[in-house]
């Protein structure tokens, strides 16, 4: 059925790269459609599992044109069906029911009859024949296997879906569901917020998710300053992760176009995806085991499909014709054309695989085991994060983190200080130092001078302090007037360097005060620059004294001749 559809689909479809949604994908798309309708009607993007299963059963009966009189019509079924059809058309995909319907129209006389009836197709999709096909459990349990225990069926299913989604994205770049599974697998820090921003940007530009990523990253890489997206663009904060994702897809496309052998190209693609998924994981990791198993099975199946295509081409005895205009990519590029055929056949077989038995597990499973983060199911990933309000506050952890970030943003970064930064403390700014002004009755012991006083009493006090300091300086070591309790005694034999530092600074300050007062008395202002000192008198003895010293130097033997020779 899928082989006939793939051979004749150019007669009914616009694109030959249309891919098929399997049974599991057909169940996930109605879930998103129902949640979207509930968002429009109730304002909440969500849906119950029972509602999904009820709509799913009615939808299958309605699309297969079976009787559904005993089943009530779900609420807003017309809108849900419209959303479902729009999603398939927008992503360039068809479901199994469409393939089943097209097979009746597209098959030729030499093709086999219908492999399934309509009721069998319904039972296959809805899962009513699972109980009869399910193998019975053995009475005695088998020996427990470490590999089976570590690698659960859920992880195997998720890992294999990621492999097929990467291959699907190479064939059909419009498949948004394939990009959803591959965007953050492996972990690229593109979580819920990044996917929401990407989805909103795609809605604004009316394009697919992959085309939005490609346009944004290419505009930054090749557009230059004038054509690059503005800094306010919502995808600007996810540039690193989006660039990593697009670079990996570019590497896969290079393998697809540069490797002529389809089998070799397919094996290289699968190996590249495996290397990306198992990077940084140990050999006993469940994801590592599932990736190894998926890689082995996919490589074997790619080799078998390539052998089948080769036999069908060579067995006719006729050389293959030139590529037709409608084949694969409308004759735009023939590189990797045969490889794309093999990948499409592989994806068609994956779409015809048995659906998942546990529908609840399928709709609620997440990818946290793959990317190492708090992943979410497909429904929660498509749900836009709501702004916190009074009725729905943030969690305590988020509030604490936001408060810490707010405090960190207010901390003033240390500025570049001068070479005198050692004179003030680290936590204080240079201009915020405290100036201490001692009273006029105390001897100034701080670095900063005391404020100027305009009264004559302060001048008299300064004169008295200067005289006291002078008297103390003139006294000998045995004539200390203040005694040891004052702390102002010093040894006269030590000279100026042995004087206490506070008293020496105070003496210099008082000398400057006296000089300023003398200048004021002579009619000059205090701020007037000081007069230049008169030039020193010339040294006695005449100018010839220095020349005589220079002439008195004796020459070495032969120095005069050598000097005259070099002067010439």
Curated annotation (Swiss-Prot):
Principal place of residence: cytoplasm
GO terms for cellular component: chromatin; cytoplasm; nucleus
Residue stretches in coiled coil: none
Gene Ontology biological process terms in this record: DNA repair; negative regulation of double-strand break repair via homologous recombination
Regions of compositional bias (Basic and acidic residues) in chain numbering: 515-527
Subcellular location(s) of the protein: Cytoplasm; Nucleus
Keywords: Cytoplasm, DNA damage, DNA repair, DNA-binding, Nucleus
Annotated region described as Disordered, given as residue ranges: 442-555
Any one GO molecular-function label of the UniProt entry: DNA binding
Biased composition (Polar residues): 488-500
PANTHER family named among the record's database cross-references: PCNA-INTERACTING PARTNER
Functional description taken from the UniProt entry: Required to suppress inappropriate homologous recombination, thereby playing a central role DNA repair and in the maintenance of genomic stability.
Family label: Belongs to the PARI family.
Protein name: PCNA-interacting partner
Organism field: Danio rerio
Gene: parpbp
């Amino acid at each position: 059925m899928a082989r006939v559809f793939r051979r004749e689909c150019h007669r009914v479809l616009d694109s030959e790269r249309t891919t098929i949604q399997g049974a599991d994908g057909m169940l996930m798309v109605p879930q998103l459609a129902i949640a979207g309708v509930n968002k429009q009607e109730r304002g909440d993007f969500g849906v119950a599992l029972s509602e999904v299963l009820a709509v799913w059963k009615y939808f299958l009966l309605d699309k297969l044109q079976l009787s559904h009189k005993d089943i009530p019509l779900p609420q807003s079924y017309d809108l849900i069906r419209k959303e479902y059809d729009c999603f398939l058309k927008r992503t360039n995909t068809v479901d199994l029911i469409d393939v089943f319907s097209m097979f009746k129209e597209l098959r030729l006389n030499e093709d086999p009859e219908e492999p399934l009836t309509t009721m069998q197709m319904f039972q296959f999709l809805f899962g009513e024949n699972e109980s009869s096909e399910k193998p019975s459990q053995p009475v005695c349990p088998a020996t427990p296997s470490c590999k089976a225990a570590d690698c659960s069926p859920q992880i195997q299913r998720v890992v294999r879906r990621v492999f097929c989604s990467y291959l699907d994205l190479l064939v059909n770049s419009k498949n948004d569901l394939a990009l959803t599974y591959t965007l953050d697998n492996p972990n690229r820090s593109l979580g819920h917020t990044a996917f929401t921003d990407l989805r909103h940007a795609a809605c604004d530009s009316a394009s697919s998710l992959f085309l939005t990523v490609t346009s944004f990253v290419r505009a930054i890489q090749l557009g230059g300053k004038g054509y690059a997206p503005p800094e306010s663009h919502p995808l600007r904060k996810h540039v690193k992760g989006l660039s990593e994702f697009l670079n990996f897809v570019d590497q896969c496309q290079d393998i697809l176009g540069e490797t002529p052998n389809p089998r070799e190209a397919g094996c290289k693609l699968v190996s590249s995806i495996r290397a990306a998924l198992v990077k940084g994981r140990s050999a006993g990791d469940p994801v590592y085991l599932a990736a190894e198993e998926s890689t082995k099975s996919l490589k074997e199946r790619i080799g078998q499909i390539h052998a089948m295509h080769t036999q069908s081409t060579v067995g006719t005895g006729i050389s293959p014709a030139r590529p037709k205009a409608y084949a694969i990519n409308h004759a735009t590029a023939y590189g990797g054309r045969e490889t794309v055929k093999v990948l499409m056949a592989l994806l068609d077989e994956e779409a015809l695989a048995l659906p998942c038995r546990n529908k609840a597990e399928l709709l609620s499973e997440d990818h946290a085991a793959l990317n190492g983060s708090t992943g979410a199911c497909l429904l929660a990933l498509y749900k836009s994060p709501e702004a916190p309000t009074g009725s729905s506050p943030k969690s305590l952890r988020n509030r604490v983190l936001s408060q810490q970030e707010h405090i960190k943003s207010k901390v003033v970064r240390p500025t570049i200080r001068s070479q005198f930064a050692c004179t003030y403390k680290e936590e204080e700014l240079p201009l915020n130092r405290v100036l201490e002004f001692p009273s006029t009755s105390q001897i100034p012991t701080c670095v900063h001078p005391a404020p100027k006083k305009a009264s004559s009493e302060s001048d008299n006090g300064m004169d008295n302090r200067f005289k006291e300091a002078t008297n103390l300086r003139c006294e000998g070591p045995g004539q200390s007037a203040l005694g040891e309790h004052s702390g102002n005694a010093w040894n006269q034999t030590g000279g100026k360097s042995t004087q206490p530092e506070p008293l020496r600074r105070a003496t210099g300050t008082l000398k400057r005060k006296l000089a300023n007062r003398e200048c004021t008395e002579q009619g000059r202002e205090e701020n007037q620059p000081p007069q230049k000192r008169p030039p020193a008198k010339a040294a006695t003895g005449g100018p010839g004294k220095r020349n005589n010293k220079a002439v008195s130097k004796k020459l070495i033997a032969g120095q005069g001749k050598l000097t005259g020779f070099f002067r010439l």
